[in-house]
Every structure is written in C-alpha cells, then in structure tokens.
Regions:
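N-terminal membrane topogenic signal
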Residues: 14-28
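Canonical alpha-helical transmembrane segments
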Residues: 58-72
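Cytoplasmic-side transmembrane-helix entry/capping segments in multi-pass membrane proteins
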Residues: 74-86
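Pore-domain transmembrane helices of cation channels
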Residues: 103-142
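Outer-pore turret/helix-boundary of cation channels
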Residues: 129-176
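Pore domain of cation channels
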Residues: 170-206
Length: 206
C-alpha cells in the first residue's frame, strides 16, 4: 500500500496572478486630495487653480488609458500615475511650507482658517503617501496582478496568518490608505511592517 502525497497548498492570492484591482478607490482618494488643495488660501499655494487643473487633467488621462481594473502592467500608465502623485506631493509640500511660514512669521490671525488649512494639508499628505505605497509595493498594482514578484515590500497581517483572511485576499488601495493613516498618526508602523529599504525610507519621509 503506497502513501498518498497530499496536494500542495495553493498559493495565496497576493502571490499569484489575479484579476487585478479596481482603480476607483484610488481615483476617488485623488479627487478628495485635489478638493483639499482647492480650499487652501491663495497665499499657501503658488497657483491655486493651475495645479489642481493639471492634476485633474492627468487623472482624466490616466482613466482614459485604463478606466476600470488594473489587471496587467503598463509602463505608460504607471509613468502618468507616478507623475501625478509627484505633482500632488510637491504641491502639498509647498502648501505646508506656506502654512508654517505664516505661523512663524506671525501673519496668521484667523485660527479657524489655520485649522482648516492644516487639516486639508494633512489629509492630502496621507492620500499622497498612500498612493506612493500602492504604486511601489511589489512593482505597483499591475505587477501585483501578474503575481511576478514573490516578496512583499509591506508585510500585512493576512500574509503572516492566511487563516485570518479569505483565500482570495490581496492588498488593495484601502489597505495602503490605512497604512498611510496609521503612519501619519502613530509616527511608526502598526499592523503593517515595511520589509525593504525603500519602504522604510518612504515611511520615514512621511
């Protein structure tokens, strides 16, 4: 009587090719960030309407290239997305500098306006870094859908204990948004651990 060899455990969804991720959560977050930029006072921005208009144009361009599900890697689409996130991040850094300059220089006299501006800059920063994490983890959403890269840049709890998640679980934009939120509030990793140098440096920059 021969021993039967048990079938090997199937690869978890985050390590194999999948149908990809809908991009609408990331797109909605981008629209919220752009709206936050538009409520900032003009003295905190270089061009109050120009930068949001450029960002909206790049977002529309990106959606025209792929309007729904990111199920494969596209170099052209990724370049547009990275450029958009870069513009968003630089514009928000400029606004943060303007806010600090007004506070230190004693030019800020309206407390309510300061609170609204600070909240808008903080939310935009959180969304911008969530997008960086989403675009860079294992090569971006397109590469993740192809299941090419074996090792994650961010270690989520579901990866360490697959019994805590459905078999088809894989990280989506909301997971990266929560990662960015906890990093911005706790100033340290919480449930998600950075595994690579770029991930650690990006969290440090945030």
């Amino acid at each position: 009587m021969t021993d039967t060899v048990p079938d090997p455990e199937p690869e978890p969804a985050w390590r194999r090719a999948t149908a990809g991720e809908s991009r609408w959560a990331a797109s909605i977050a981008l629209l919220i960030a752009i709206a936050c930029q538009m409520v900032l006072p003009v003295e905190f921005t270089t061009h109050r309407w120009l930068v949001p208009a450029i960002e909206l144009g790049m977002l529309v361009w990106s959606l025209l290239m792929n309007p729904n599900r990111i199920d494969r890697h596209s170099g052209a689409l990724r370049r547009v997305n990275l450029a958009l996130i870069g513009v968003l991040t630089l514009a928000n850094a400029r606004a943060a500098w303007g806010l600090v300059d007004h506070i230190v220089g004693g030019q800020a006299t309206n407390a309510g306006r300061l609170l609204v501006s600070g909240a808008a800059i903080w939310v935009t920063n959180m969304i911008a870094f969530a997008l960086w994490y989403w675009e860079f983890d294992r090569g971006g959403p397109g590469r993740r859908s192809e299941g090419i890269r074996e090792y994650p840049d961010f270690l989520f709890p579901q990866m360490q204990n697959p019994d805590l998640a459905p078999k088809d679980w894989e990280p989506s934009f909301v997971d990266y948004l929560y990662l960015s939120f906890t990093n911005a509030t706790a100033f340290s990793p919480t449930d998600v651990l950075p595994m690579t140098q770029w991930a650690k440096l990006t969290m440090l920059a945030q």
